[in-house]
From Swiss-Prot:
<comment type="function">
    <text>The UvrABC repair system catalyzes the recognition and processing of DNA lesions. A damage recognition complex composed of 2 UvrA and 2 UvrB subunits scans DNA for abnormalities. Upon binding of the UvrA(2)B(2) complex to a putative damaged site, the DNA wraps around one UvrB monomer. DNA wrap is dependent on ATP binding by UvrB and probably causes local melting of the DNA helix, facilitating insertion of UvrB beta-hairpin between the DNA strands. Then UvrB probes one DNA strand for the presence of a lesion.</text>
</comment>
<comment type="subunit">
    <text>Forms a heterotetramer with UvrA during the search for lesions. Interacts with UvrC in an incision complex.</text>
</comment>
<keyword id="KW-0742">SOS response</keyword>
<feature type="short sequence motif" description="Beta-hairpin">
    <location>
        <begin position="91"/>
        <end position="114"/>
    </location>
</feature>
<dbReference type="Pfam" id="PF00271">
    <property type="entry name" value="Helicase_C"/>
</dbReference>
<dbReference type="InterPro" id="IPR004807">
    <property type="entry name" value="UvrB"/>
</dbReference>
<protein>
    <recommendedName>
        <fullName>UvrABC system protein B</fullName>
    </recommendedName>
</protein>
<keyword id="KW-0234">DNA repair</keyword>
<dbReference type="Pfam" id="PF12344">
    <property type="entry name" value="UvrB"/>
</dbReference>
<dbReference type="InterPro" id="IPR024759">
    <property type="entry name" value="UvrB_YAD/RRR_dom"/>
</dbReference>
<keyword id="KW-0228">DNA excision</keyword>
<dbReference type="InterPro" id="IPR001650">
    <property type="entry name" value="Helicase_C-like"/>
</dbReference>
<dbReference type="GO" id="GO:0004386">
    <property type="term" value="F:helicase activity"/>
</dbReference>
<keyword id="KW-0067">ATP-binding</keyword>
<dbReference type="InterPro" id="IPR006935">
    <property type="entry name" value="Helicase/UvrB_N"/>
</dbReference>
<dbReference type="Pfam" id="PF17757">
    <property type="entry name" value="UvrB_inter"/>
</dbReference>
<keyword id="KW-0963">Cytoplasm</keyword>
Length: 661
């Protein structure tokens, strides 16, 4: 069995050793919930990694969005190169759920675009959880949505071992039952092909490796791992396990039982609709469901098959659907990152999903069982979650209640950096004073972040500062992902000195060059000026030893008082620690590589073209598809050098698209 092993030049420092010991002690004493209060720059991810290494338990890390999940995944991957670090988020690039608007009698069909790279990574995650214990899965909150039953998923695997006999037709049929497609021409992920005594399989969890099964009669002689593009043999395998090409694969017997259950529910529902004198809904439901039943009978699947998932999993009405949590072993560990955002998200998901599906059921578009194709209710998630460590700089009420208000603090940064000095100034002449502060900060060689309450004010302030010849930019929700990254890079490099935003200057904005954070209208109580928002925004100045925060306010609100008091408390603890240990705070010197993924793209893609691709996901997908065809064409023409070059370019584009999605 592989143990977790961190590969890093760093060792736990500051508050990290104490926090690691406290959390591990809590886990050993069977505490179900613990709270790790980690301030900006305290090394929360590194602390989590050390807890995982010491406890040696399979781990799920939940984040509140794909971007944060990708960031944690990247960090964990670099810390645990010898272990299985997996990424599990929604595989939709675009998703429009089916819906019915009764007011206008408008039915909206489900429309979606699946990201093949993310689908591959989801398969790799579930496979790792079923095959090994040294697994870290980094997930968004979408992991609470229904997934195929792990029992059926594992029951359907095909085990292959050299020296064993296999009936060829039966093996091919087994692959088809796993929803693999036979394709002797276009060999890609989720396909298999037959050539003489060889069967090639492109597993669902690989992007650049395939397996070649070499037979002598019915006996499997060899299993080789090979490069599907060049045909080069990479390794000889002692065994291979083929998992389903979908998480919803199931035996034919299960499909037959499900069809019977669907037919029974359909008859009951039709009788009910007739008794309610709803002929249109009756006819609509019968027609749609009968079509789905025909498809299930003929192919074992249908469009929207997930709406019948309760029948396939054998669950009763109202019971929770199988999710990623059922793939976790009993002794798994759960970290909920930025829990003050993640926990409310989990709480909200069920109600929104049910409201939409309830309308579909009432108007005859779906059977009532479709309501059971859903995310977990908050209470169900709370019941299923294993031992949990909530992680946040600003814990929410649920986490504090679960832990009895007890928190494990990460306040001392390994770098010795202090929480920024907080200054409160009148809001009456805030813009005039801000200009003076901007001049001072720029003269020191630092950058300025300014947060406003409204989009209009942000736009007007940006325009005004630009008129005064300050290098200013405005960060808002309409800025494309790539453009956002470029703006932040320009800010760090000094191309921009001042960045103005609204709610985009909180979690995850890492600017060591920032010497001043200015919060305008700080005394306007509300979501953007709550205690949590203020603490998170103040944290943006904590990467710089000279970092300051100015809160412009004409009155002292409860939120300002609490946020400033908490910042001062932390600052005093940090100062005392530094004095005791002779530490001089130094600004983090972090390399500017925000556009690394973008700049790695082959030189054939000029900057203007790449801008266009990343600004328009549809164009990017079209370009990726075009590259795939060119690569396969080059390979079929035996132009392997060109094919490999195209493959590398394609891989870079797909990775960049994944991180920028």
């Amino acid at each position: 069995m592989n143990n977790f092993s961190i590969i890093s030049e760093y060792k736990p420092a500051g508050d990290q050793p104490k926090a690691i010991d406290e959390i591990i002690a809590g886990l050993s004493s069977k505490k179900r919930s613990q709270m790790l209060l980690g301030i900006t720059g305290s090394g929360k991810t590194f602390t989590m990694a050390n807890i995982i290494e010491r406890t040696n338990r399979p781990t799920l890390i939940m984040a509140h969005n794909k971007t944060l999940a990708a960031q944690i995944y990247s960090e964990m991957k670099s810390l645990f190169p010898k272990n299985a670090v997996e990424y599990f988020v929604s595989y939709y690039d675009y998703y429009q759920p089916e819906a019915y608007i009764a007011r206008t009698d408008t039915f909206i069909e489900k429309d979606s675009s699946i990201n093949e790279q993310i689908d591959l990574m989801r398969h790799a995650a579930t496979r790792s959880l079923l095959e090994r214990r040294d697994v870290i899965v980094v997930s968004s909150v979408s992991c609470i949505y229904g997934l195929g039953s792990p029992d059926l998923y594992y029951q359907m695997v095909v085990n292959l071992e050299p020296g064993q006999s296999y009936l060829r037709d039966q093996l091919l049929n087994d692959l088809i039952n796993l929803q693999y497609e036979r394709n002797d021409i276009g060999f890609e992920r989720g396909c298999f092909r037959v050539k003489g005594d060889n069967i090639d399989i492109f597993p669902s969890h690989y992007s650049d490796k395939a397996w070649r099964l070499s037979f002598f009669g019915n006996e499997l002689e060899y299993i080789h791992e090979f490069d599907p593009l060049t045909g080069e043999k990479l390794a000889k395998l002692d065994k291979a396990i083929v998992f389903g090409n979908s998480h919803f694969v199931m035996p034919q017997e299960t499909v037959n039982n499900a069809i019977s259950g669907i037919e029974e529910e359909l008859q009951k529902r039709l009788e009910f609709l007739k008794s309610q004198d709803k002929p249109l809904e009756t006819q609509r439901l019968n027609q749609r469901t009968q079509y789905d039943l025909e498809m299930l009978t003929e192919t074992g699947s249908c469009k929207g098959v997930e709406n019948y998932s309760r029948f396939f999993t054998g669950r009763n009405a109202g019971e929770p659907p199988p999710t990623l949590f059922e793939y976790l072993p009993e002794d798994a560990l759960l970290f909920v990152d930025e829990s003050h955002v993640s926990v409310p998200q989990i709480r909200a998901m069920y109600n929104g999903d049910r409201a939409r599906k309830k309308v579909l059921v009432e108007h005859g578009f779906r059977l009532p069982s479709a309501l059971d194709n859903r995310p977990l209710k908050f209470e169900e998630w709370d019941k299923f979650r294993p031992q949990t460590v909530f992680v946040s700089a600003t814990p929410g009420p649920f986490e504090l209640e679960e832990t009895g208000g007890t928190v494990v603090e990460l306040i001392i940064r390994p770098t010795g950096l202090l929480d920024p000095e907080c200054i409160i100034k009148p809001a009456t002449n805030q813009v005039e004073d801000l200009i003076s502060e901007i001049q001072t900060t720029i003269a020191q060689g630092f950058r300025v972040l300014v947060t406003t309450l409204t989009k209009k004010m942000a736009e007007d302030l940006t325009a005004y500062l630009q008129e005064l010849k300050y290098k200013t930019s405005y960060l808002h929700s309409n800025v494309h992902t790539l453009e956002r990254i470029e703006i932040l890079r320009d800010l760090r490099q000094g191309t921009i000195d001042v960045l103005v935003g609204i709610n985009l200057l909180r979690e995850g904005l890492d600017i060591p060059e920032c010497g001043l954070v200015a919060i305008l209208d700080a005394d306007k109580e509300g979501f953007l000026r709550s205690e949590v928002s203020l603490i998170q925004t103040i944290g943006r100045a904590a990467r710089n030893s000279a970092g300051r925060v100015i809160l412009y306010a004409d009155k002292m609100t409860k939120s300002i008082d609490k946020a400033v008091s908490e910042t001062l408390r932390r600052r005093q603890i940090q100062q005392e620690y530094n004095e005791k240990h002779g530490i001089i705070p130094k600004t983090i010197n972090r390399a500017i590589h925000a556009l690394a993924e973008f700049e790695k793209i082959d030189s054939k893609l000029d900057k203007k073209q790449a801008h266009t691709l990343f600004d328009n996901p549809a164009k990017l997908k079209t370009h990726i598809d075009k590259l795939k065809k060119e690569m396969l064409k080059a390979a079929s023409n035996l132009e392997f050098e060109q094919a490999v070059k195209l493959r590398d370019q394609l891989k870079t584009l797909e990775e960049a698209a994944l991180e920028l999605s």
